[in-house]
Amino acid sequence: MSATALGMIIFAYLCGSISSAILVCRIARLPDPRENGSGNPGATNVLRIGGRVAAAAVLVFDILKGMLPVWLAYKLDVPPLYLGLTAIAACLGHIYPVFFHFRGGKGVATAFGAIAPIGWDLTGLMTGTWLLTVLLSGYSSLGAIISALIAPFYVWWFKPQFTFPVAMLSCLILMRHHDNIQRLWRGQEGKIWGVFRKKKNDAAEQEEKKEE
C-alpha cells in the first residue's frame, strides 16, 4: 500500500467521523439525535426531531463526506482496491466516529456519496432504486436495504473492478440495519410518511393553542 492510499483511507475515516447530525442539532439547538427519536444520528431521525431544513443539511453533508475522499483518491490515481477501502473507511467513520465516542449512524447517505464517483449512471440507478422502494413501501429503511442488496450487481455491470469493495460496503450497511430488518419482519417499522403526519399534527395543535 502506498503512502497516498494509506493517507486517503485515514482522511476518509476522519471525514466520516464528523457527525453532521449531531453538529446540525447543536447549531439549531435541537435535541441530541442519539438520545431522541430513533436514537440514530442520521438525516431521517433529524427530520423526525428537527424538520426538513435540518434534515436536508445533514443529508447533503453526509453525502459529501463520503464523496469527497473517494473523489480525491480517484484523482490521485489510487488503485481500485484501495479506492474501495477509502469508501469503506468513510462509512466506518460515520458509523464509529472517533470525535463522538464511536456512536454514529447507519452510513447510508455516506455510502451513497462514496459510490457516486464511480459513475453518474450508477448514481442514478441507486437513487432510483431507493426512491422507488420508498414510494412503493413507505419505508426509508427498506429503501436502504434493497439498495444495499442490489448495489454490487449494479457496480459489477458498470465497473466490475469495484464490485468487491462495494459488496463489503453493502454488508456493512445491512449489518447496521439488523434492527430495522427485524422490525420490518414483525410489521413494527415506522413509515416515513408518519414523520410528516406528526409534523403536520404538531403544527395544527400549535395553531389551535394560539387561537385559544
From Swiss-Prot:
- Where does the protein end up? Cell inner membrane
Gene name tied to this protein: plsY
Quaternary structure and partners? Probably interacts with PlsX.
Any single biological process term in GO: phospholipid biosynthetic process
NCBIfam families per the record? glycerol-3-phosphate 1-O-acyltransferase PlsY (TIGR00023)
Q: What is this protein called?
A: Glycerol-3-phosphate acyltransferase
Listed PANTHER family: GLYCEROL-3-PHOSPHATE ACYLTRANSFERASE-RELATED, INNER MEMBRANE PROTEIN YGIH
Question: Pathway membership of this protein?
Answer: Lipid metabolism; phospholipid metabolism
Q: Report how it sits in the membrane.
A: Multi-pass membrane protein
Report the family membership.
Belongs to the PlsY family.
Protein's organism: Serratia proteamaculans (strain 568)
